[in-house]
Amino acid sequence: MEPNPIFSEFQLEFFKRIKMQPKSIETLNDVSEVMSGCAQIFSFENLDVVANTTEPLNREVIIQQLVNNKQGGLCYKINSVFYYFIKSFGFNIYQVRCCVENQETHDCWQINGAHIINIIEYENKKYLADVAFGCNLSYEPIPFSEEIIESCTGLYRIRKVDNIIRDIKYTYLLEFKKPDSFSPESARLWTNGYAFDPLVKAIDIDENDKIDSHATQIQQLIIDDPTKEFSVKPLATKVVNNESIATLTSNSFTLTNCKTGEKTKVTFDINNEIKQLEQFNQHLISIFNLPPLKFLPKI
């Protein structure tokens, strides 16, 4: 890749958004720096879905929302804006859709194809670059070699698998775990994240940027999901100061130490709707730098 000292408006705005000095993105170390910036800036949140303010998505809309309007989003927005940015520097990067294991019960798989990731081909090797798997973030590309990548949020690896999900041909599995200092002990065991096939590319992104069908399709899958996991209950989560994970729900705010698992929790007054909304918005603004909600949905 040739050095590119002249940056596009989008590139400059993206650098500004993730608080990174403009530079030519040429190596995996450069990509890691971008991933680190994304992890610390973009909130993984579903507030537009909950508030029923979603719109059809394309490159222009996603950039407007996440870069210019300083919003967060779910995987189909955050991973897509990262994809646009890295691709603009000439990287061989493409997207793949995955199936996520239920991260609460770990006893079932969720909607097939409802998570989207980035695959980078660099020096004849493939790497996974996911900046939007909740706060399970590697901060650097993960090689397809079972090499363990460690970040402040945990340890990550990719394993080749067969028949991980019945009747669906997936060939690789992302696994993660917490460090040995983390409590509870069960979190220190390797856990399934999601299954995918790196050869099945999400290639039908409209070249004229009229519609990014994969982002729009996944958004609709989330809205139509009968379990309503991401469509009814407001959620915002992000890494704070590379040491804690902040999680905001309609009922509480929790700060979890990445190394120990120690939690500090603030419970909202659910018996007083006005006060509950005030408490929610206070944290939404101060921790996540997101605009306040007008109401909290009744669940």
Curated annotation (Swiss-Prot):
SUPFAM superfamilies: Cysteine proteinases
Entry EC no(s): 2.3.1.5
Catalytic activity: an arylamine + acetyl-CoA = an N-acetylarylamine + CoA
Molecular function (Gene Ontology), one example: arylamine N-acetyltransferase activity
PANTHER family (alphabetical): ARYLAMINE N-ACETYLTRANSFERASE 1-RELATED, N-HYDROXYARYLAMINE O-ACETYLTRANSFERASE
Family annotation (InterPro entries): Arylamine_N-AcTrfase, Arylamine_NAT_domain_sf, Papain-like_cys_pep_sf
Protein name as catalogued: Probable arylamine N-acetyltransferase 2
Family recorded in the similarity comment: Belongs to the arylamine N-acetyltransferase family.
Catalytic residues identified in the record: 75, 115, 130
Keywords linked to the UniProt accession: Acyltransferase, Transferase
Group of enzyme by EC: transferase
